Amino acid sequence: MNARLSLVLAVAVAITAGTFVTVATVAATRVSNVQIDDWQMQGTATHAAWPLWQLRVTSAFGNAAAREALADVLVNSTRLDERREGVELYRQLALDGAPRAQATLGHLLLRGLPGIAPDYVESRHWLTLAASHDSRDAQVAYDLATLYRNGYGMVRDASLAIRWLERAAQAGLPLAQFQLANEYRFGTSLPHDDALALQWLTRAANAELPEANLALAMAYRNGELGLARDESEYWAHVKESEHDLKHVSRQ
Protein backbone atom coordinates (compact mmCIF):
# COMPACT_ATOMS: atom_id res chain seq x y z
CA MET A 1 0.00 0.00 0.00
CA ASN A 2 2.77 2.40 0.93
CA ALA A 3 4.65 1.55 -2.24
CA ARG A 4 1.53 2.18 -4.30
CA LEU A 5 0.93 5.52 -2.57
CA SER A 6 4.55 6.52 -3.16
CA LEU A 7 4.17 5.71 -6.84
CA VAL A 8 1.00 7.80 -7.11
CA LEU A 9 2.69 10.71 -5.36
CA ALA A 10 5.74 10.42 -7.61
CA VAL A 11 3.54 10.48 -10.71
CA ALA A 12 1.64 13.49 -9.35
CA VAL A 13 4.87 15.37 -8.66
CA ALA A 14 6.17 14.53 -12.13
CA ILE A 15 2.96 15.74 -13.76
CA THR A 16 3.02 18.94 -11.68
CA ALA A 17 6.66 19.59 -12.51
CA GLY A 18 6.04 18.89 -16.18
CA THR A 19 3.05 21.20 -16.19
CA PHE A 20 5.10 23.94 -14.52
CA VAL A 21 7.88 23.62 -17.08
CA THR A 22 5.36 23.67 -19.93
CA VAL A 23 3.56 26.73 -18.56
CA ALA A 24 6.86 28.51 -17.84
CA THR A 25 8.13 27.75 -21.33
CA VAL A 26 4.95 29.06 -22.95
CA ALA A 27 5.05 32.16 -20.72
CA ALA A 28 8.69 32.83 -21.62
CA THR A 29 8.10 32.52 -25.35
CA ARG A 30 5.20 34.96 -25.09
CA VAL A 31 7.16 37.72 -23.39
CA SER A 32 6.95 40.72 -25.72
CA ASN A 33 10.00 42.18 -27.44
CA VAL A 34 9.08 45.51 -25.86
CA GLN A 35 9.45 43.96 -22.40
CA ILE A 36 12.73 42.33 -23.37
CA ASP A 37 14.03 45.65 -24.73
CA ASP A 38 13.03 47.31 -21.46
CA TRP A 39 14.92 44.73 -19.38
CA GLN A 40 17.90 45.10 -21.68
CA MET A 41 17.98 48.90 -21.33
CA GLN A 42 17.57 48.70 -17.55
CA GLY A 43 20.25 46.05 -17.22
CA THR A 44 22.73 47.96 -19.38
CA ALA A 45 22.07 51.37 -17.81
CA THR A 46 21.79 50.41 -14.13
CA HIS A 47 23.48 46.98 -13.90
CA ALA A 48 20.61 46.06 -11.58
CA ALA A 49 20.09 42.42 -10.64
CA TRP A 50 16.34 42.26 -11.36
CA PRO A 51 16.30 42.88 -15.15
CA LEU A 52 19.33 40.61 -15.54
CA TRP A 53 17.51 37.85 -13.64
CA GLN A 54 14.41 38.31 -15.79
CA LEU A 55 16.49 37.95 -18.94
CA ARG A 56 18.26 34.88 -17.57
CA VAL A 57 14.98 33.14 -16.73
CA THR A 58 13.27 34.06 -20.00
CA SER A 59 16.36 33.00 -21.95
CA ALA A 60 16.58 29.69 -20.07
CA PHE A 61 13.08 28.79 -21.26
CA GLY A 62 14.01 29.21 -24.91
CA ASN A 63 13.27 32.84 -25.77
CA ALA A 64 15.82 33.68 -28.50
CA ALA A 65 15.38 37.46 -28.23
CA ALA A 66 15.96 37.32 -24.47
CA ARG A 67 19.10 35.26 -25.01
CA GLU A 68 20.59 37.88 -27.32
CA ALA A 69 19.52 40.70 -25.00
CA LEU A 70 21.14 38.86 -22.08
CA ALA A 71 24.40 38.57 -24.02
CA ASP A 72 24.33 42.32 -24.71
CA VAL A 73 23.74 43.21 -21.05
CA LEU A 74 26.52 40.88 -19.93
CA VAL A 75 29.20 42.23 -22.30
CA ASN A 76 28.41 45.72 -20.99
CA SER A 77 28.70 44.63 -17.36
CA THR A 78 31.15 46.20 -14.91
CA ARG A 79 32.20 42.68 -13.88
CA LEU A 80 34.84 40.79 -15.85
CA ASP A 81 33.25 37.38 -15.22
CA GLU A 82 29.95 38.62 -16.66
CA ARG A 83 31.68 40.18 -19.68
CA ARG A 84 33.35 36.83 -20.36
CA GLU A 85 30.00 35.08 -19.96
CA GLY A 86 28.46 37.53 -22.43
CA VAL A 87 31.16 36.89 -25.04
CA GLU A 88 30.68 33.14 -24.63
CA LEU A 89 26.91 33.51 -24.98
CA TYR A 90 27.39 35.53 -28.17
CA ARG A 91 29.71 32.77 -29.39
CA GLN A 92 27.00 30.15 -28.78
CA LEU A 93 24.47 32.30 -30.64
CA ALA A 94 26.92 32.79 -33.51
CA LEU A 95 27.55 29.05 -33.70
CA ASP A 96 23.78 28.57 -33.89
CA GLY A 97 23.87 30.68 -37.06
CA ALA A 98 22.40 33.97 -35.79
CA PRO A 99 23.74 36.65 -38.22
CA ARG A 100 23.34 39.55 -35.78
CA ALA A 101 25.21 37.65 -33.08
CA GLN A 102 27.98 36.83 -35.58
CA ALA A 103 28.28 40.53 -36.45
CA THR A 104 28.31 41.60 -32.80
CA LEU A 105 30.82 38.95 -31.76
CA GLY A 106 33.09 39.89 -34.65
CA HIS A 107 32.94 43.55 -33.59
CA LEU A 108 33.62 42.72 -29.93
CA LEU A 109 36.60 40.53 -30.80
CA LEU A 110 37.98 43.26 -33.06
CA ARG A 111 37.79 45.96 -30.38
CA GLY A 112 38.22 43.84 -27.28
CA LEU A 113 36.64 44.57 -23.91
CA PRO A 114 38.13 45.62 -20.56
CA GLY A 115 40.00 42.51 -19.41
CA ILE A 116 39.33 40.67 -22.70
CA ALA A 117 41.93 41.01 -25.44
CA PRO A 118 40.99 41.28 -29.12
CA ASP A 119 41.14 38.13 -31.24
CA TYR A 120 41.55 39.31 -34.83
CA VAL A 121 41.52 35.86 -36.43
CA GLU A 122 38.23 34.84 -34.80
CA SER A 123 36.86 38.33 -35.41
CA ARG A 124 37.46 38.02 -39.17
CA HIS A 125 35.82 34.58 -39.17
CA TRP A 126 32.56 35.84 -37.67
CA LEU A 127 32.50 39.10 -39.60
CA THR A 128 32.97 37.27 -42.89
CA LEU A 129 30.10 34.93 -42.00
CA ALA A 130 27.90 37.87 -41.02
CA ALA A 131 28.71 39.64 -44.30
CA SER A 132 27.71 36.53 -46.24
CA HIS A 133 24.23 36.85 -44.71
CA ASP A 134 23.95 40.61 -45.25
CA SER A 135 26.51 42.33 -47.48
CA ARG A 136 24.80 45.70 -46.80
CA ASP A 137 25.56 45.70 -43.07
CA ALA A 138 27.59 48.90 -42.79
CA GLN A 139 29.28 48.14 -39.46
CA VAL A 140 30.32 44.64 -40.53
CA ALA A 141 31.80 46.04 -43.76
CA TYR A 142 33.62 48.78 -41.84
CA ASP A 143 35.04 46.30 -39.32
CA LEU A 144 36.33 44.10 -42.15
CA ALA A 145 37.87 47.17 -43.79
CA THR A 146 39.63 47.94 -40.50
CA LEU A 147 41.05 44.42 -40.27
CA TYR A 148 42.35 44.40 -43.86
CA ARG A 149 43.63 47.99 -43.76
CA ASN A 150 45.70 47.41 -40.63
CA GLY A 151 46.68 43.81 -41.28
CA TYR A 152 45.19 42.65 -37.99
CA GLY A 153 45.63 38.87 -37.76
CA MET A 154 46.55 38.67 -41.46
CA VAL A 155 48.69 40.19 -44.18
CA ARG A 156 47.60 43.77 -44.89
CA ASP A 157 45.43 43.99 -48.03
CA ALA A 158 44.73 47.55 -49.19
CA SER A 159 42.48 46.54 -52.09
CA LEU A 160 40.18 44.43 -49.89
CA ALA A 161 40.19 47.19 -47.28
CA ILE A 162 38.96 49.70 -49.88
CA ARG A 163 36.34 47.28 -51.18
CA TRP A 164 34.85 46.87 -47.70
CA LEU A 165 35.21 50.57 -46.92
CA GLU A 166 33.23 51.41 -50.08
CA ARG A 167 30.50 48.98 -49.04
CA ALA A 168 30.30 50.56 -45.59
CA ALA A 169 30.16 54.06 -47.09
CA GLN A 170 27.50 53.10 -49.62
CA ALA A 171 25.48 51.47 -46.81
CA GLY A 172 25.42 54.84 -45.04
CA LEU A 173 28.06 54.70 -42.29
CA PRO A 174 29.27 58.31 -41.83
CA LEU A 175 32.74 57.39 -40.55
CA ALA A 176 33.29 55.15 -43.57
CA GLN A 177 32.12 57.96 -45.86
CA PHE A 178 34.59 60.34 -44.22
CA GLN A 179 37.48 57.88 -44.54
CA LEU A 180 36.59 57.13 -48.16
CA ALA A 181 36.59 60.88 -48.84
CA ASN A 182 40.12 61.06 -47.44
CA GLU A 183 41.23 58.13 -49.62
CA TYR A 184 40.13 60.10 -52.70
CA ARG A 185 41.40 63.39 -51.34
CA PHE A 186 44.93 62.25 -50.56
CA GLY A 187 45.23 59.47 -53.14
CA THR A 188 46.34 56.96 -50.52
CA SER A 189 44.84 53.72 -51.86
CA LEU A 190 42.64 55.25 -54.57
CA PRO A 191 43.39 57.65 -57.44
CA HIS A 192 43.22 61.29 -56.34
CA ASP A 193 39.76 62.69 -57.12
CA ASP A 194 38.60 65.97 -55.55
CA ALA A 195 35.05 65.62 -56.87
CA LEU A 196 34.52 62.21 -55.28
CA ALA A 197 36.27 63.35 -52.12
CA LEU A 198 33.87 66.29 -51.85
CA GLN A 199 30.88 64.06 -52.57
CA TRP A 200 31.69 61.63 -49.76
CA LEU A 201 32.79 64.36 -47.38
CA THR A 202 29.49 66.19 -47.91
CA ARG A 203 27.50 63.01 -47.25
CA ALA A 204 29.38 62.42 -44.00
CA ALA A 205 28.90 66.06 -42.97
CA ASN A 206 25.17 65.87 -43.73
CA ALA A 207 25.06 62.84 -41.42
CA GLU A 208 26.39 65.09 -38.62
CA LEU A 209 29.87 63.61 -38.33
CA PRO A 210 31.84 66.35 -36.49
CA GLU A 211 35.18 65.71 -38.19
CA ALA A 212 33.53 65.77 -41.61
CA ASN A 213 31.94 69.16 -41.01
CA LEU A 214 35.23 70.51 -39.69
CA ALA A 215 37.11 69.18 -42.74
CA LEU A 216 34.49 70.73 -45.02
CA ALA A 217 34.85 74.03 -43.16
CA MET A 218 38.60 74.05 -43.79
CA ALA A 219 38.05 73.17 -47.45
CA TYR A 220 35.87 76.28 -47.82
CA ARG A 221 38.35 78.46 -45.96
CA ASN A 222 41.34 77.30 -48.03
CA GLY A 223 39.55 76.87 -51.36
CA GLU A 224 40.23 73.12 -51.55
CA LEU A 225 38.42 70.21 -53.26
CA GLY A 226 37.39 72.49 -56.12
CA LEU A 227 35.52 74.86 -53.78
CA ALA A 228 35.79 78.63 -53.93
CA ARG A 229 36.95 80.32 -50.72
CA ASP A 230 33.87 81.16 -48.69
CA GLU A 231 34.08 82.50 -45.11
CA SER A 232 30.34 82.23 -44.52
CA GLU A 233 30.37 78.53 -45.46
CA TYR A 234 33.47 78.08 -43.32
CA TRP A 235 31.74 79.44 -40.22
CA ALA A 236 28.51 77.60 -40.98
CA HIS A 237 30.32 74.26 -41.00
CA VAL A 238 32.39 75.14 -37.92
CA LYS A 239 29.15 75.81 -36.04
CA GLU A 240 27.66 72.62 -37.42
CA SER A 241 30.65 70.62 -36.19
CA GLU A 242 30.20 72.13 -32.71
CA HIS A 243 26.54 71.15 -32.81
CA ASP A 244 27.50 67.62 -33.89
CA LEU A 245 29.94 67.29 -30.98
CA LYS A 246 27.28 68.34 -28.47
CA HIS A 247 24.89 65.82 -30.00
CA VAL A 248 27.50 63.04 -29.72
CA SER A 249 28.30 63.92 -26.09
CA ARG A 250 24.62 63.56 -25.15
CA GLN A 251 24.36 60.05 -26.60
Segments from the language model and where they lie:
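N-terminal leader/linker segments that initiate helical-solenoid repeat arrays
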Residues: G18-N76
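Structural signature of tandem alpha-helical TPR/SEL1-like repeats
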Residues: T44-P51, L80-L89, I116-W126, V155-W164, ...
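Canonical positions in the second alpha-helix
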Residues: R56-T58, Y90-L93, L129-A130, R167-A168, ...
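N-terminal Sec-pathway targeting helices
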Residues: N2-A12
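Hydrophobic face of amphipathic alpha-helices that form TPR/SEL1-like repeat modules
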Residues: R67-N76, T104-G112, I116, A141-N150, ...
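TPR/TPR-like (Sel1-like) alpha-helical repeat modules
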Residues: Q199-T202, N206, L214, M218-R221, ...
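Short helix-capping/linker turns of helical repeat alpha-solenoids
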Residues: A60-A64, N76-T78, L95-P99, G112-L113, ...
